Structure formats: C-alpha cells, structure tokens
Amino acid sequence: MEQAPEDQGPQREPYNEWALELLEDLKNEALRHFPRPWLHGLGQYFYNTYGDTWEGVEAIIRTLQQLLFIHYRIGCQHSRIGITPQRRRNGASRS
C-alpha cells in the first residue's frame, strides 16, 4: 500500500493547540449566555472529576458545545438561530 511521505500534505495545527483554542472560544461564547458563577461551578466539577487532563478538556468541550446548541435551539434572545415561538390568532393548532 502506498503512503505519502510524512513531510508532505497539508500542515496541521497540533491537536492540543487546537483543543485549547476551541475551549477558549467556547468559554467566551458561553460567558455571553450563561452566568459566570454557574460556568465556574461547571469548570470545577470537570476539574474535580478529570483533574488537569486532556480527557477533561475534551469532556468540557463536548459539554459546552451541547449546552450552547440546546440554548440556541430553544431560542436564545441573542441569536437568530433556534425555534421561534409562533403566535396564533385563534388558538388553533396545526398538526
């Protein structure tokens, strides 16, 4: 089986650098939508559970992504993404 030499192909950012940048971006976005003390408690939970490990970084990235997705989907006031409540004049619902 043919393989490309290791020094060819697109340059990729090291995984740990990418993960830390992603975590920083998610943290900043989460701070716009959730209370700081609540996020601090969440961070403490992950630190107490995983310690200072990459497994903990991956777990908090997944959790923040899920929280933000659900928050947007429910209908964040800061975003146009999500389910917009529809008003009905006569109260009838369409199924």
Swiss-Prot record:
The keyword Phosphoprotein is assigned to this record: yes
Post-translational modifications: Phosphorylated on several residues by host. These phosphorylations regulate VPR activity for the nuclear import of the HIV-1 pre-integration complex.
Coarse class of the primary localization is virion
Superkingdom field: Viruses
Membrane-crossing residues?
Answer: none
State the residue spans of region: Homooligomerization.
1-42
Q: Where in the cell is it found?
A: Virion; Host nucleus; Host extracellular space
Q: Which InterPro entries does the record cross-reference, listed alphabetically?
A: RetroV_VpR/X
Do the record's keywords include Phosphoprotein?
Answer: yes
Q: Which UniProt keywords apply?
A: Activator, AIDS, Apoptosis, Cell cycle, Host G2/M cell cycle arrest by virus, Host nucleus, Host-virus interaction, Ion channel, Ion transport, Modulation of host cell cycle by virus, Phosphoprotein, Transcription, Transcription regulation, Transport, Viral penetration into host nucleus, Virion, Virus entry into host cell
GO biological process annotation, one example: symbiont-mediated activation of host apoptosis
UniProt GO cellular component terms: host cell; host cell nucleus; host extracellular space; virion component
Q: Which residues carry this modification: Phosphoserine?
A: S79, S93, S95
- Family indicated by similarity: Belongs to the HIV-1 VPR protein family.
Miscellaneous comment as given in the Swiss-Prot or TrEMBL entry = HIV-1 lineages are divided in three main groups, M (for Major), O (for Outlier), and N (for New, or Non-M, Non-O). The vast majority of strains found worldwide belong to the group M. Group O seems to be endemic to and largely confined to Cameroon and neighboring countries in West Central Africa, where these viruses represent a small minority of HIV-1 strains. The group N is represented by a limited number of isolates from Cameroonian persons. The group M is further subdivided in 9 clades or subtypes (A to D, F to H, J and K).
Self-association and partners = Homooligomer, may form homodimer. Interacts with p6-gag region of the Pr55 Gag precursor protein through a (Leu-X-X)4 motif near the C-terminus of the P6gag protein. Interacts with host UNG. May interact with host RAD23A/HHR23A. Interacts with host VPRBP/DCAF1, leading to hijack the CUL4A-RBX1-DDB1-DCAF1/VPRBP complex, mediating ubiquitination of host proteins such as TERT and ZGPAT and arrest of the cell cycle in G2 phase.
What's this protein's function?
During virus replication, may deplete host UNG protein, and incude G2-M cell cycle arrest. Acts by targeting specific host proteins for degradation by the 26S proteasome, through association with the cellular CUL4A-DDB1 E3 ligase complex by direct interaction with host VPRPB/DCAF-1. Cell cycle arrest reportedly occurs within hours of infection and is not blocked by antiviral agents, suggesting that it is initiated by the VPR carried into the virion. Additionally, VPR induces apoptosis in a cell cycle dependent manner suggesting that these two effects are mechanistically linked. During virus entry, plays a role in the transport of the viral pre-integration (PIC) complex to the host nucleus. This function is crucial for viral infection of non-dividing macrophages. May act directly at the nuclear pore complex, by binding nucleoporins phenylalanine-glycine (FG)-repeat regions.
The name of this protein is: Protein Vpr
